[in-house]
């Protein structure tokens, strides 16, 4: 009798609040099969993600070798689960160097082809003809149904800064007004920071903070706006957190970075104000520097309320900034598992995505992708 009771206890189903609590500790990649056990389990997974341990934006790090066949690998960090995974997938057809822009866009461009991907896990690649004008190191942005390509280094008639727009609906390129003249001396993407919302592309010159916005629907530039927080900020980048533009600035000078701060951009009818949101703890600033005594640049990948910051010259440490309670900054760091002595010379591209169960289900259903814990 006691053995029967023990057996019944061991086989008792887990349900309700207990099941949701258990599922809140399960990595997101394992919640896909869990949600398919039964309808009650599916409901428990959804409830657990909504109330106990919500999904957080993933950072996805793409690497590409610099020699033929230019193989690519993809790793993703899930902050909800504090877990790195390698995403095994079919090789990406090589067009040129793999690059990323404004957190969500991956692209490759050559004189003949332009390839791009913008879904959360970059499962799908789109191939188009190359822009009319060839240029190296341009700025590239996806705004709504338009891809904008501008700047770079080239010589195109009387217009040194050609600008082209690709319409996703028609599959055609159009030329339009060039970058504002004030940005022409900094037209390469390495000198500019790009951010987008649903209607506009925002371009900031990293040193001066001079910013313009571009609306591809009517091909109109707006600005200039001054987004330099102060004279003690020697380099800054822009992004979006909780649908609000933010500025991340390096304090001091290129030889001696003394700090990193975050500001919210508040735009009025005629002026732009900056409100300080937080300052990175110094121990994280030192991690950001890595082995180098200097911190000359900073890069941002952001989505929702979470920003990932890294040093382009020393990307071994990733700094997390989570905006909570509207405007408070919660700081943390995680080691970039992609960076090691073997692949130190490979090309890195960073994207940030809201990866949900549907995105993971699509990846699993393809049959040729696997998620492997690192």
Where are these regions (language model features)?
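Amphipathic alpha-helical protein-protein interaction segments
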Residues: 7-15, 27-34, 156-159
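C-terminal closing repeat unit and adjoining cap/tail of repeat-based domains
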Residues: 259-374
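Short helix-loop-helix/strand-helix junction enriched in hydrophobic and basic residues
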Residues: 32-50, 77
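A sequence/structural signal of beta-propeller blade repeats
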Residues: 71, 87-261, 329
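CRL adaptor-proximal regions
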Residues: 1-16, 21, 369-374
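An edge-strand/N-cap motif at the start of beta-rich repeat modules
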Residues: 53-82
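Short loop/turn motifs that recur once per blade in beta-propeller domains
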Residues: 9-14, 28, 48, 87-95, ...
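Hydrophobic, repeat-rich solenoid/adaptor surfaces of innate immune receptors and signaling proteins
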Residues: 25, 31-37, 148-149, 201-203, ...
């Amino acid at each position: 009798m006691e053995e029967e009771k023990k057996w019944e206890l061991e086989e008792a189903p887990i349900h309700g609040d207990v099941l949701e609590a258990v599922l809140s500790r399960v990595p997101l990649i394992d919640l896909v099969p869990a949600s398919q056990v039964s309808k009650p389990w599916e409901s428990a997974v959804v409830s657990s993600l909504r109330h106990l341990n919500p999904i957080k934006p993933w950072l996805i790090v793409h690497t590409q070798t610099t020699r033929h066949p230019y193989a690519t690998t993809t790793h993703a960090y899930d902050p909800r689960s504090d877990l790195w995974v390698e995403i095994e997938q079919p090789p990406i057809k090589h067009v040129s160097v793999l690059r990323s822009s404004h957190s969500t866009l991956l692209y490759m461009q050559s004189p003949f082809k332009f390839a791009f991907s913008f879904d959360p896990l970059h499962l799908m690649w789109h191939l188009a003809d190359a822009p009319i004008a060839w240029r190296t190191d341009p700025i590239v942005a996806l705004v709504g149904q338009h891809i904008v390509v501008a700047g770079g280094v080239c010589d195109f008639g009387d217009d040194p800064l050609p600008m082209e727009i690709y319409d996703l609906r028609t599959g055609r390129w159009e030329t339009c007004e060039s970058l504002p003249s004030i940005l022409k001396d900094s037209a390469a993407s390495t000198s500019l920071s790009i951010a987008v919302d649903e209607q506009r592309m925002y371009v900031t010159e990293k040193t001066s903070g001079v910013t313009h916005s571009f609306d591809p629907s009517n091909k109109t530039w707006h600005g200039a706006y001054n987004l330099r927080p102060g004279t003690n900020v020697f380099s800054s980048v822009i992004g979006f957190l909780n649908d609000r533009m933010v500025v991340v600035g390096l304090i001091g000078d290129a030889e001696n970075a003394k700090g990193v701060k975050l500001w919210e951009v508040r735009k009025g009818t005629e002026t732009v104000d900056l409100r300080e949101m937080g300052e990175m703890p110094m121990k994280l600033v030192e991690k950001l520097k890595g082995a180098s005594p200097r911190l000359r640049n900073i890069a941002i990948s952001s989505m929702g309320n979470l920003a990932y910051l890294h040093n382009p010259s020393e990307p071994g440490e990733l700094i997390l900034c989570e905006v909570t309670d509207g405007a408070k900054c919660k700081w943390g760091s995680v080691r970039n598992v992609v960076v090691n002595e073997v692949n130190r010379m490979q090309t890195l591209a960073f994207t940030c995505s809201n990866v949900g169960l549907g995105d993971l289900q699509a990846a699993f259903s393809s049959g040729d992708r696997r998620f492997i814990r690192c």
